[in-house]
Amino acid sequence: MTRTTHFGFKTVSETEKAREVAGVFDSVAERYNLMNDLMSGGMHRLWKRFAIEVSGVRTGERVLDIAGGTADLSSLFLEQVGSRGEVWLTDINNSMLTIGRDRLLDEGTAVPVAQCDAEKLPFPTNYFDCVSVAFGLRNMTHKDVALKEMLRVLRPGGCVIVLEFSRIWKPLQRLYDLYSFKVLPAMGGLVAKDRDSYRYLAESIRVHPSQEELKQMMQKAGFERVQYFNLAANAVALHRGYKF
């Protein structure tokens, strides 16, 4: 029997979701950073800096950036760990990974990169001090499996940080829906020449677990001291959990 999952509001086979998500990011990769700036008014850069602060990463530590895409977090983590540290930039999508790698090279920095599935990480157990995923978890087919893999590669005492869109403050829901389903696709069509991918973005946010649901998923995966920080009227949440 074919196993199904969500691709936005559609129910599709797991194989089809992987193919569809790959198509989305192949399409938007070249305009990804520009669209992020336009969609969030540049706020995504502040959210990512906050994620770095909350991670507590220090000089000399090892960091795994999952779904690292255009390397926003990897670039910031590099500033924290310094020359004695190690930052791995990973993504399942080659188009996104190539842009991130080339960006870091243009900045004069070379980091190890790996195209890999977050559900099957090619790293040893108990290796990293911090694992991060920003705006990538909702695209994963088996979020529970990916979270368990993140736990596996963390060393005891290490933390995971998950930055993701979440459930907005209810009084703003109608305005947010108007923005998500009318403005975003129009903006995507104008700037990235792809309305459908940004329609998927809006839909994928709506079917992603709430703040409390994701907290429970992380706890079930084995993370401890899980907490979250609501940002931008709850439209975005940063979750943090530890491995002990």
Swiss-Prot record:
Top-level taxon: Bacteria
A GO BP annotation: aerobic respiration
Signal peptide: none
Short name of one Pfam family: Ubie_methyltran
InterPro entries: SAM-dependent_MTases_sf, UbiE/COQ5_MeTrFase, UbiE/COQ5_MeTrFase_CS
Catalytic activity: a 2-demethylmenaquinol + S-adenosyl-L-methionine = a menaquinol + S-adenosyl-L-homocysteine + H(+); a 2-methoxy-6-(all-trans-polyprenyl)benzene-1,4-diol + S-adenosyl-L-methionine = a 5-methoxy-2-methyl-3-(all-trans-polyprenyl)benzene-1,4-diol + S-adenosyl-L-homocysteine + H(+)
CDD domains (UniProt xref): AdoMet_MTases
EC number: 2.1.1.163, 2.1.1.201
Binding-site residues for S-adenosyl-L-methionine, renumbered to this chain: T70, D91, D117, A118
Listed GO MF terms: 2-methoxy-6-polyprenyl-1,4-benzoquinol methyltransferase activity; demethylmenaquinone methyltransferase activity
Entry annotated with the keyword Metal-binding: no
Gene3D superfamilies: Vaccinia Virus protein VP39 (3.40.50.150)
SUPFAM superfamilies: S-adenosyl-L-methionine-dependent methyltransferases
UniProt KW keywords: Menaquinone biosynthesis, Methyltransferase, S-adenosyl-L-methionine, Transferase, Ubiquinone biosynthesis
Annotated transmembrane regions: none
UniProt entry tagged with the keyword S-adenosyl-L-methionine: yes
Pathway: Quinol/quinone metabolism; menaquinone biosynthesis; menaquinol from 1,4-dihydroxy-2-naphthoate: step 2/2; Cofactor biosynthesis; ubiquinone biosynthesis
Classification via PANTHER family: 2-METHOXY-6-POLYPRENYL-1,4-BENZOQUINOL METHYLASE, MITOCHONDRIAL, METHYLTRANSFERASE
Similarity-based family: Belongs to the class I-like SAM-binding methyltransferase superfamily. MenG/UbiE family.
Function per UniProt: Methyltransferase required for the conversion of demethylmenaquinol (DMKH2) to menaquinol (MKH2) and the conversion of 2-polyprenyl-6-methoxy-1,4-benzoquinol (DDMQH2) to 2-polyprenyl-3-methyl-6-methoxy-1,4-benzoquinol (DMQH2).
Name assigned to this protein: Ubiquinone/menaquinone biosynthesis C-methyltransferase UbiE
Species whose genome carries this gene: Nitrosospira multiformis (strain ATCC 25196 / NCIMB 11849 / C 71)
Name of the gene encoding the protein in the UniProt record: ubiE
